[in-house]
Design a protein with these regions (language model features):
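Activation-segment/catalytic-loop signature of the eukaryotic protein kinase fold
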Residues: 155
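Activation segment signature within eukaryotic-like protein kinase domains
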Residues: 192-193
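C-terminal lobe helix-coil module of Hanks-type protein kinase domains
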Residues: 200, 219, 251-354
Length: 356
């Protein structure tokens, strides 16, 4: 009867809104079979058929792949949405999901949207714990306002995807300048790391530890000389968390000894990671290299890194001193704050400019 068809039609709209296009198609087909002239059901059916052929999102059991990927085509069908954001294009793939360029249709603001299909990586109580931690930390990170920290606008969940909407930045991540053939001039590298140290000082004073500082998590716009630290609030998931496949997420090469040991970390762990980043950006080499994770963990915990002047004899001795202090195994002998590290870098940069 008409009331049943109306209920089914509304169910189809609900599936469409949730991007469960195959289910919407099945419902609208049923309505068409019983009343081809019902409302705009013919157009809805056609639209959802087109969309279901073009887009795959999240863990939709009747579609593949199921890794939280949107397949975006350039045909004339309506663009997919995550939360309130329209997805425009793909920016890249992160450790746990995709990053998209999107916009907020209400205010027209462009945003980068990082998605994570947490249910693909964790299960049961662990999944609930990770989700709670993710939302708590992302909301805390959203309260950070600093010229060298990427602004987080929104965090949410849509179907099986958790997402963070953040400022869309021009520039490249620092990995572009961490290879021996594409290093920045030393003074410019110091300017970049000073900005990052000041950003971390601010975050640590706000009781936020990043836990995944590395070149890939800093975006540098060389045209205006500004670097921004990104992925605050995401790193809580990569803090040596093991997924259900047993994989350790995160970047062990940049982790402090205490982080690799699974101990509670504070801001000084981030400063160790920033020291590793500085070393790599001055030499194109990581300070600790090994053939296996176990061997790498042993080296970071117990062995001294090669003196940076083995690679860069042109640099003044203060560079070695800054690196050695940042990479000290003992917490109390490391830089105690981002501000302290920034000041040491600025002093050393002045000696650098006298030398060159």
């Amino acid at each position: 009867d008409a009331s049943l068809l109306n209920q089914l039609y509304n169910l189809g709209l609900d599936y469409e809104r949730k991007r469960q296009y195959n289910k919407a198609v099945a419902v609208f087909k049923y309505v068409v079979a019983h009343d081809p002239g019902f409302s705009d059901v013919q157009e809805r059916l056609q639209h959802n058929r087109e969309v279901s052929e073009q887009f795959v999102l999240g863990n939709n059991k009747s579609s593949t792949p199921s890794d939280g990927t949107l397949i975006i085509s350039n045909s004339g069908v309506q663009k997919p949405m995550i939360g309130r954001y329209v997805i425009d294009s793909e920016l890249g793939r992160g450790a746990m999901g995709m990053v998209y360029l999107g916009h907020d249709p209400k205010i027209g603001r462009s945003v980068a949207i990082k998605t994570m299909s947490l249910s693909q990586e964790f299960e049961g109580d662990k999944l609930a714990d990770v989700k709670e931690r993710f939302f708590r930390e992302a909301e805390t990170a959203g309260r950070l306002h600093h010229p060298n920290i990427v602004t987080i606008f929104d965090v949410g969940e849509d179907q099986d995807l958790s997402y963070i909407a953040m400022d869309y930045l021009k520039g490249e991540n620092l990995m572009a300048y961490a290879k021996s053939e594409s290093l920045l001039p030393a003074q410019e590298t110091f300017d970049v790391i000073v900005q990052a140290a000041e950003a971390l000082d601010y975050a640590h004073n706000e009781k936020v530890v990043h836990r995944d500082i590395k070149p890939a998590n800093m975006i540098y716009d060389r045209d205006n000389g500004i670097v921004k630290v990104t992925d605050f609030g995401v790193a809580c998931l990569t803090d040596t968390s093991k997924t259900k496949t047993g994989t350790i997420l995160g970047s062990p090469s940049y982790m402090s000894p205490e982080q690799l040991a699974g101990a509670k970390v504070d801001g000084r762990s981030d400063l160790f990671s920033l020291g590793v980043t500085l070393y790599q950006m001055l030499t194109g080499e990581l300070p600790f290299i090994a053939d296996s994770l176990a061997s790498l963990m042993y080296k970071i915990a117990n062995e001294k890194h090669p003196d940076i002047r083995m690679f860069r004899p042109d640099l003044p001795s203060c560079v070695s001193q800054v690196i050695n202090k940042a990479l000290h195994k003992e917490l109390d002998r490391r830089f105690q704050s981002g501000s302290q590290m920034a000041k040491a870098l600025i002093r050393c940069r002045e000696r650098l400019s006298k030398k060159h």
